[in-house]
Amino acid sequence: MFFAGFGCLIPFLPLWLEKVHGFSGAEIGVVLAIAGFSRAVAGPLTAAWAHGRSDRRAPLFMFTLLLTVGFGVLYVLDSFAAVFAVILVLDIAYWGLLPVVETALLRLTRTAKPTYGVARGLASAAFVIGTTVVGVLNDWSGSFWPIWGFMLVISALMIGGSVWMPREPVLARAEIAQPFGDRLLAGLGMLRNSNFTLFIFAAGLIQASAGFLYTSGSLVWANQQGMSSKEISMLWNIGTLAEVGFLMFLGNWSARFRPETLIVAGGIGAVVRWTALAALPPLWVLIPLQLLHSLSFAATFLGGMRFIQTIHGDDRAPTAQMIYMGLANAPTYAAAVLISGPLYDRLGAPGYLAMTAVAAVGLVLAVLLWLKRDTSPRTGEVPGQSNGRS
């Protein structure tokens, strides 16, 4: 359900803001960017709070309730300030759920079937379903209200899903009894690990380089290339299906490579992808470019998850994920989004070239991390991975 909602939120929220609320590209960029910057504060705070709960479902309850109330209120709002305030909360809540869901998948598939790659691939398939359903409903209804309705229903269903899930207690650990401030400092203390710090900014910049695509990609396809919602949905789905295929069918194969190698591959894919999209390629070229999502996102993502799990283990992985998303991924993504709106308004598709530069910086950092891969001791290896990898 979470990823089906993501399939609506990422490609269609900018269209909702433009078509229903009349926001310009710059205003859309401001709304999404400020929400992203706010995650830099909310991420570590949420991580410290969640790390002190005795039930791993606690963040699910909190975030899904916020989402349902937020989307319900969004229907009656009209002013820029009011919509901005609600989108801020919704963005923090939805992205706050992501590390909780991701680490739960990684943890629960460790000792049970399906494998993580298959489970994450199925989750990405739900993204495709969400994108397809909303795209078809938009065209069928001739409006953009299905975007709001779909997100409200998904958010409400996630509350029910959180209640239905069996309680998963956290094994006794000292952090639960620690004061909130101590847990917060312990989480931030992860940054003392230089490899972890280099990783979060390498992967963060590579993934943040998708900011123009997520903010203005649908607008470019609709307004500059005259595509329908169905065609836009198809392009998004091709990218996501490439992600699904990589995770489900190449996930185990990719385990022969070090996590750092996957991140480098993701950086290369991102540089090629954004450079080509800047040229307004025809549909037959857009299709293979969308397949590069398997590198720019999936390889970077999988490498990042394995890197975090390797150095921090099960108990600390959710906190490490939130620190990564809060202090590196969110601010860099927010900055990319902030410049994407004005770039789209002034340049259109050539604005992708700014994302090429962002991805290139991330690639350089990833190469530096790869070069350091044998210089620092690790706390362990993720099951299913072997030593001596490339």
Predicted regions and their residues:
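Structural signature of the two symmetry-related core transmembrane helices
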Residues: 58-72, 152, 261-276
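Cytoplasmic helix-loop-helix junction between adjacent transmembrane helices
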Residues: 88-122
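Symmetry-related core transmembrane helices of the 12-TM Major Facilitator Superfamily/SLC fold
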Residues: 146-163, 351-370
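Helix-loop junctions at membrane interfaces in 12-TM secondary transporters
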Residues: 75-87, 278-290
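Helix-to-loop junctions at the C-terminal end of transmembrane segments
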Residues: 41-55, 138-139, 246-259, 344-345
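Juxtamembrane intracellular "pre-TM" segments in multi-pass secondary transporters
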Residues: 165-202
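Helix-loop boundary and gating motifs at the non-cytosolic
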Residues: 1-36, 195-233
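A late C-terminal transmembrane helix in Major Facilitator Superfamily
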Residues: 318-347
